[in-house]
Amino acid sequence: MSERSVSKSREQKRWYSVLAPEQFDRQELGETLAEEPDQVVGRTITTTLGELTGDSGANNTKLTFKITDVGSDTAYTEFIKYELTRDYLRSLVRRGASKVEASITVLTTDDYRIRVQPVALTTKKADRSQEKAIRRVMIDKVHAAAEDRTFESFVDAIVEGNLSSAIYGDAKLIYPLRRVEIQKLTLEARPSEVAAEEETAVDVDADEVAVDADE
């Protein structure tokens, strides 16, 4: 492609300002370039919690947003992932100590399906039964948090450290802990997607019943 063609193509594109959801005060996340608004929808943008809050101590936390709508020259997003940086996670690990992890899928009260991955770091090496008990606390606390929170309030509980503190409070009674973190949260399905999956499951069950009846 000639330089003139590239220049003309770029001139036909426009910049869209990408905003965080209202939950994050509609802060500007950056800009994205496209010829048409529908080319912007579906794109993702990642920033750090530190950049949104002005707290450099939170730069070890990455937040990912997905563009869902465009109005004029503004692109609106939804939150889809919270994740600690690899460097930060590596810095937490100590030789001669235990690292206890869990991966838990739950539904919030407004039917968002999310996967939550907590991690606990002990002061010294815990035995297998203690690690299992700590993991059980993680699972119970995450389920309890989802049972009385919307997706937005669940995300707030993680960003503000409330969920990790709740896990720490109970798990430290099993074995001394140095740290508990939520290393990752991922949005797996929205309410409409969850409902569609449930309808499909019901249809399959109905078909199986019909086959059994024919037999």
Curated annotation (Swiss-Prot):
GO BP, sorted A to Z: translation
Cell inner membrane in keyword set: no
Top-level taxon of the source organism: Archaea
SMART domains: Ribosomal_S3Ae
Record key words, sorted: Ribonucleoprotein, Ribosomal protein
GO cellular component terms listed in the entry, alphabetical order: ribonucleoprotein complex; ribosome
GO terms for MF: structural constituent of ribosome
Matches recorded under InterPro entries: Ribosomal_eS1, Ribosomal_eS1_arc
Ribosomal protein is among the record's keywords: yes
Family to which this protein belongs: Belongs to the eukaryotic ribosomal protein eS1 family.
NCBIfam families documented for this protein: PRK04057.1
Protein's name according to its UniProt entry: Small ribosomal subunit protein eS1
The organism of origin for this protein: Halorubrum lacusprofundi (strain ATCC 49239 / DSM 5036 / JCM 8891 / ACAM 34)
Phylogenetic classification of the source organism: Archaea, Methanobacteriati, Methanobacteriota, Stenosarchaea group, Halobacteria
Designated gene of the protein: rps3ae
